Amino acid sequence: MKKIFTFALATLMAGNMMAQMHGVLNFAGASTANVLNQNVENPSDTVKFEMVNAASGNITLPNITNDNLVISSFTIANVAFTMGANHVVTMPDQTFATKVTVGGEEKNITGSSLKGTYNMADNSLTLNLTFKYGAMPFDMTYSIKAYYIKPVASAITVNVGGAFNYNNENVTYSVRK
């Protein structure tokens, strides 16, 4: 009987731990891309984070534009992280490699550095990456300070000049949490 209760308790705890693993988390914020001292700033990029397990996750970056160069969105799999004190998650400096298909051609992305933090107190994500794209001989850096956003669906009513009402019952917008 004791084994049955122990098994039931372990099953409930495992289920509770899995419930803590969220789906994809979206973070929006200002970013900077740099190649050969040419900075391109974007006031609002969205980065996605999906937990794989309690020590790693997948990070998806948006399209990165630097003058005439557009790097398609790509995912970095199994980014390692540790949970620290004061609800701060740290992604220690690590290398990465991934591929992206552009116009039917596969391009390698080789990262010499990825590091970042997620602060649960203010829901902010900071990432800094250095990588080479395809046959590009120069390093590209990408950095972003973003905040967790959550889609909210609710009706919205706008009154213009006290004379015109606009109602939309089916609107979804992202709210910074």
Regions found by a protein language model. Name each.
Residues Q20-A28, N39-P43, S73-N86, S113, ...:
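Edge beta-strand at a domain terminus
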